[in-house]
């Protein structure tokens, strides 16, 4: 099931004609969204992270103000999109005590796992490269098949062992035995 969700302070849906220009809600509106999610939570184990793109959309002072306001209202974590430097991360980390989730890649010197852990970063997403790699692999495979490559000659195919691992074959077999036999 779902164990966590992020509630963002981005103006959604984007108004007509504003493509590429992210706008943020006011801080009081953002706080209201966070409070609504917290009040609606029925499972106390569900993590609610307050998400803001302020580091990349406005400035760090605004991001800091938002992070502190969302922590004060009671979110379980802060999800920041657009933090690019250690200095930016340290400003946030020094100001709040709840876990930090980073979205989007920062500078390479910032991606040290021990450093991130020291700064209370618990999740660090580094973009959509895995999805992009999967799209390219699917495209290349379909193109090769269309051009006549026999399936047994395709390159980059996952081994049977890897397929069993990533598809949780044991869980599947257990459910099959439990429900379908």
Name the predicted role of every residue range.
Residues 2-128, 132-144, 172, 177-181:
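Alpha/beta enzyme core
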Residues 145-181:
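Flexible C-terminal active-site loop/helix
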């Amino acid at each position: 099931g779902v164990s966590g969700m992020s509630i963002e302070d981005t103006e959604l849906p984007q108004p007509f004609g504003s493509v590429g220009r992210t706008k943020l809600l006011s801080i009081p509106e953002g706080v209201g969204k966070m409070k609504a999610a917290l009040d609606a939570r029925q499972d106390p184990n569900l993590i609610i992270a307050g998400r803001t793109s302020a580091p990349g959309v406005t400035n760090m002072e605004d991001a800091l103000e938002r992070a502190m306001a969302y922590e004060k209202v009671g979110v379980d974590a802060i999800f920041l999109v657009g933090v690019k430097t250690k200095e930016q991360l340290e400003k946030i980390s020094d100001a709040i005590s709840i876990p930090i989730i980073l979205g989007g890649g920062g500078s390479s010197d910032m991606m040290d796992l021990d450093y991130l852990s020291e700064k209370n970063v618990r999740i660090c997403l580094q973009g959509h490269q895995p999805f992009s790699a999967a799209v390219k692999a699917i495209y290349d495979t379909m193109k090769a098949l269309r051009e006549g490559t026999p399936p047994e000659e395709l390159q980059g195919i996952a081994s049977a062992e890897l397929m069993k691992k990533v598809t949780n074959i044991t869980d599947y077999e257990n459910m099959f035995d439990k429900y379908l036999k």
